[in-house]
């Protein structure tokens, strides 16, 4: 994301700006057991550390219970700091990762370029119009302005894919790539690719799995 941000900053004459990246720790269902909840927090922290995110939105071991206490918030922060500190000097390199990065870049370009087009060069205006048109679409977002038609699901290995891109303007080859990955999961699980996968994935981590499996 930082590479693409630098590209668009130069393209749009915003080179004197600083853009930060953020990782939100798991936003779905959390396990009620605090030890298991800390594992989920550590998992998200590890992703943030390896991705070199600028900041992290931290969860607590009380996510499944209700409003966290001050002490629970502090525990979540300490757990996150420890995990990030342990991985501060580590890098993840693999051909599979490079492929995923290339795909994410193409998907991002498709959305950002369309937003520029909708705004006729004005990205602020383009972003507003893109949200209204569903070009920028956030799954499960509570905002009344969000289009809310795009649906994600994990593939068999746990990567998040587009089950239904809706109005997100992905090139046909990327739509097919995403669907093929989900169809492979469906085949391995002996079921159809459907909205049930989305539901299963939302609750999977609270049940101790990354990918939601059928009963």
Descriptions of predicted regions:
Residues 53-215:
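Acidic, glycine-enriched catalytic cores built around paired aspartates
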Residues 1-81:
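Helix-rich catalytic cores of soluble enzyme domains
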């Amino acid at each position: 994301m930082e590479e693409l941000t630098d590209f668009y900053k130069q393209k749009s004459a915003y080179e004197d700006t600083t853009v930060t990246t953020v990782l939100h720790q798991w936003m779905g269902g959390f396990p009620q057991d605090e030890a298991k909840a800390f594992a989920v927090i550590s998992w998200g922290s590890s992703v943030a550390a390896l991705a070199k995110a600028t900041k992290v939105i931290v969860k607590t071991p009380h996510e499944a219970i209700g409003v966290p206490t001050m002490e629970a918030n502090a525990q979540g922060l300490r757990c996150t700091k420890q995990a990030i500190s342990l991985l501060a000097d580590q890098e993840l390199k693999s051909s599979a990762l490079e492929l995923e990065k290339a795909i994410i870049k193409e998907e991002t370009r498709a959305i950002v370029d369309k937003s520029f087009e909708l705004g006729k060069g004005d990205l602020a205006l383009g972003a507003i119009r893109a949200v209204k048109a569903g070009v920028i679409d956030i799954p499960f977002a509570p905002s009344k302005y969000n289009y809310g038609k795009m649906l994600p699901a994990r593939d068999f290995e746990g990567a998040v894919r587009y089950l239904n891109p809706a109005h997100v303007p992905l090139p046909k080859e990327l739509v097919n790539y995403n669907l093929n990955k989900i169809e492979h999961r469906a085949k391995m699980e002996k079921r159809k690719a459907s909205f049930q996968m989305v539901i299963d994935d939302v609750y999977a981590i609270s049940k101790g799995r990354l990918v939601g499996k059928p009963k």
